[in-house]
From Swiss-Prot:
Purpose of the protein: Specifically catalyzes the N1-methylation of pseudouridine at position 54 (Psi54) in tRNAs.
Domain of life: Archaea
GO biological process: tRNA methylation
Key words, A-Z: Cytoplasm, Methyltransferase, S-adenosyl-L-methionine, Transferase, tRNA processing
Broad EC category: transferase
Name used for this protein in its record: tRNA (pseudouridine(54)-N(1))-methyltransferase
Record carries keyword DNA repair: no
InterPro entries listed in its UniProt record: Alpha/beta_knot_MTases, TrmY, tRNA_m1G_MTases_N
Cysteines engaged in disulfide bonds, as pairs: none
GO cellular component: cytoplasm
Length: 207
């Protein structure tokens, strides 16, 4: 399984503060929507065995599970509406029990650290790997092309902001690798696409 944990620092937790007419104005929610689309969609379908976790204001995590998604479209407005619905269900997220928003979409009352604990404590889905591998995507990391693709990776990346000091400390302690996808800085959603391509083409010699 491939998993992406995207940190949204400025997205409001109040669903009433999210306007579908001004998605970027909701703490650059548009960027998180594009990360979801890049994470779960193919040209004419949905990927298998992919999850995207959006950490909102280090308070809630909205999870999109590609294997269970229904009636989700790749446009920003559709994804933003699903995120807003998730935040609207926050009263149903009690403790670490999720609120079921729609097929394939859940909201948990968890920040980054608790989300990483939960994701990393879930055994990998490949017989070749017992545990997921946490990989931080960062401009100061090692070149992606020099790294061997992990079997059950969990990639952590930030939105348009850099990682906060506490996030950097947490990832320095928990991440097994820190990699950079290329020589130029990319938007978070483009980074997700590059990582997918890296994993998709591993072992391919011809197309």
């Amino acid at each position: 399984m491939r998993q992406f944990v995207v940190i949204g620092h400025d997205v409001p937790t109040d669903p009433d503060a999210i306007s579908l007419s001004d998605i970027p104005g909701a703490g650059r929610l548009d960027l998180l929507c594009r990360c979801v689309a890049a994470g779960v969609f193919l040209s004419h379908g949905i990927r298998e065995r992919v999850r995207v976790h959006l950490v909102v204001a280090d308070e809630f995590t909205v999870t999109f599970d590609a294997d269970s998604l229904r009636h989700l479209h790749p446009d920003e407005r559709n994804v933003a509406a699903r995120i807003r619905d998730a935040l609207d269900a926050q009263d149903d997220a009690i403790g670490h029990m999720p609120a079921d928003v729609s097929p394939g979409v859940e909201l948990r009352r968890m920040g980054l650290e608790a989300t990483l604990d939960r994701v990393l404590d879930t055994p990998g889905t490949s017989s070749a790997s017992a545990d997921p591998t946490l990989v931080q995507l960062h401009e100061d990391g090692d070149p992606l092309v020099d790294a061997a693709p992990p079997t059950d990776p969990v990639f952590v990346l930030s939105d348009h902001n850099d990682f906060a000091p506490a996030e950097r400390d947490l990832l320095a302690d928990r991440a097994e690798r820190r990699v950079r996808v290329g020589p130029e800085l990319l938007h978070a959603d483009h980074t997700v696409s590059v990582v997918h391509n890296w994993l998709d083409t591993d072992g391919y010699e011809s197309y």
